[in-house]
Amino acid sequence: MKLSLTTPKGALVDTDVEEVTAPGDLGELGVLPGHVPLMTALRPGVLSYKAKDHDGIVAVGQGFLQVAPLPRAADAPARDRVLVLVDQALAAADIDREAAARELAQADKELAAWRGELDGAYHALVLRRGWAQARLDAVARAPGAAH
């Protein structure tokens, strides 16, 4: 399978993979070769993938995931493409754990004190909290992380 993970700033991952796990809106979603075509919403969380020579851990924001067959020549084997479009993403190795922890604590404090409507501002705060938690979770799941 071909995994392409893109943000508005550009491509973060573009590699052949054997497996992808992503944070779907309804729960964690696993994709293996031959998966049925689908499109689903993603929530902030951890996307992981297994390639032949390495594994990857990426914190992702909200977005979409699509699984579809790649175009191919008549004599070529079938391959799938996993396209991930998210508003933000960071490889686990590039995450500042302390900054994410501070942002999570601040978002939790603001949510606990929230007395306003459950409107766009509230939704933005929930997403900010989710992004901070996603980064902390990615760091915790990265190889060599202290547990």
Predicted regions and their residues:
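Absolute protein N-terminus
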Residues: M1-K2
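Compact, glycine-rich, soluble single-domain proteins
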Residues: T6-Q106
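Acidic/glycine-rich phosphate/pyrophosphate-binding loops and surrounding catalytic core
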Residues: D75-A78, L83, A89-H147
